[in-house]
Design a protein with these regions (language model features):
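Short, conserved catalytic or adaptor-binding loops enriched in Gly and charged residues
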Residues: 34-36, 77-80
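Conserved RNP beta-strands of RNA recognition motif
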Residues: 57
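Conserved short beta-strand edge segments in small beta-sheet-based binding/regulatory domains
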Residues: 78-92
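Short S/T/G/P-rich N-terminal loop/turn motif that feeds into the first structured element of a domain
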Residues: 1-53, 62-69, 90-101
Length: 101
């Protein structure tokens, strides 16, 4: 099951300039691989638009519960304090096309 996550932070909370955000972001990124593995999640890709302070991530999770449990991990919740994130289930174009037949 694919999930699209968009996360935006303010320039003031950007980890490139905010010391506290940098510490929390460092902890989050250091634990991300073990946390995704713990919940059976594969990060398909993650992209950053630096001028917009926007991060876009696509994850492949076994189900919605796994994704929710991952997002409730303390390191994820701590980083969420510096940004506004939206996570939604998505389909590939090929999967969506089946509904149009």
């Amino acid at each position: 099951m694919l999930f699209l996550q968009t996360a935006r932070h303010s320039p003031e909370s950007c980890p490139t300039h905010n010391y506290e955000a940098k510490k929390v972001f460092g902890t989050f990124t250091a634990k991300m691989e073990s946390l995704t593995k713990k919940h059976g999640i594969k990060v398909v890709g993650s992209w950053v638009s630096m001028p917009e302070h926007l991060v876009v991530t696509v994850c492949d999770a076994p189900n919605q519960e796994a994704m929710l449990n991952y997002m409730m991990e303390p390191e994820i919740m701590a980083w969420s304090g510096y940004q506004v994130a939206e996570t939604r289930p998505v389909l590939t174009l090929e999967e969506a096309a089946k509904f149009a037949k």
